[in-house]
From Swiss-Prot:
Transmembrane segments: none annotated. Contains 2 disulfide bonds. N-glycosylated. It catalyses: an L-alpha-amino acid + O2 + H2O = a 2-oxocarboxylate + H2O2 + NH4(+). The lineage of its organism: Eukaryota, Metazoa, Chordata, Craniata, Vertebrata. Its EC number is 1.4.3.2. It comes from the Eukaryota. Catalyzes an oxidative deamination of predominantly hydrophobic and aromatic L-amino acids, thus producing hydrogen peroxide that may contribute to the diverse toxic effects of this enzyme. Exhibits diverse biological activities, such as hemorrhage, hemolysis, edema, apoptosis of vascular endothelial cells or tumor cell lines, antibacterial and antiparasitic activities, as well as regulation of platelet aggregation. Its effect on platelets is controversial, since it either induces aggregation or inhibits agonist-induced aggregation. This is L-amino-acid oxidase ACTX-8. One of its GO terms (cellular component) is extracellular region. Homodimer; non-covalently linked. It is found in: Secreted. It comes from Deinagkistrodon acutus.
């Protein structure tokens, strides 16, 4: 994740929830 890409970081932090 990157501070310039909050959506990408959100996806990484919530990957299991998205499954």
């Amino acid at each position: 994740a990157d501070d310039r890409n909050p959506l990408e970081e959100f996806r990484e932090n919530n990957y299991e929830e998205f499954l």
